[in-house]
A protein has these predicted regions:
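C-terminal segment of classical bacterial N-terminal signal peptides
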Residues: 17-26
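Hydrophobic alpha-helical targeting segments used for export or membrane insertion
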Residues: 9-13, 17
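Bacterial Sec-dependent N-terminal signal peptides
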Residues: 1-10
Length: 153
């Protein structure tokens, strides 16, 4: 009988530790996490807004993970390089995570602000936007907020 109680106590303790570990692991997963990645443009191309992006330029891509759904977003970045722009508006290519959203990006000094708006919630993980620079760039996310119109009704 004592042996059975010890086994039950050991199983209960192991279950409790496993449950706590699960809570810690899930707490580490940030929702609406914005990540930055870099790649080199292989061939010169013309962006949708008419900006010529030369071969060898750096493509800076923002992507989202654990997307909870949003119809509007504001992302503020710090950038150590000037981004390719037309009339002060950063030349950017929308990714699949923005869906049919209207996206605008502008740079003022080291600050880059990207704003989006859509009638529908986007719940897709993946690329938000890609923009370009001809010099070495380091871009960090200062702040990112995502709002859903459906949540505010």
């Amino acid at each position: 009988m004592k042996q059975t109680k010890k086994i039950i106590a050991a199983l209960a303790a192991a279950t409790m530790v496993a449950s706590c570990a699960g809570v810690v692991a899930s707490a580490d997963e940030a929702v609406n996490a914005v990540n930055v990645s870099y790649s080199t443009v292989a061939e010169t191309f013309t962006a949708a807004d008419g900006t010529v992006v030369p071969a060898g330029a750096t493509a800076v891509t923002l992507s989202i993970e654990n997307n909870t759904g949003f119809s509007a977003s504001d992302i503020t970045l710090n950038a150590t390089a000037d981004l390719l722009a037309v009339d002060g508006m950063v030349a950017a290519t929308n990714g699949s995570a923005y869906g049919d959203a209207i996206v605008s990006a502008a740079q003022n000094g080291s600050k880059v602000v990207i704003t989006s708006a859509s009638l529908d919630d986007s719940k897709a993980d993946g690329t938000l936007v890609t923009f370009y620079t001809t010099s070495a760039a380091e871009v960090t996310v200062e702040d990112a907020s995502f709002e859903s119109v459906k949540n505010n009704e």
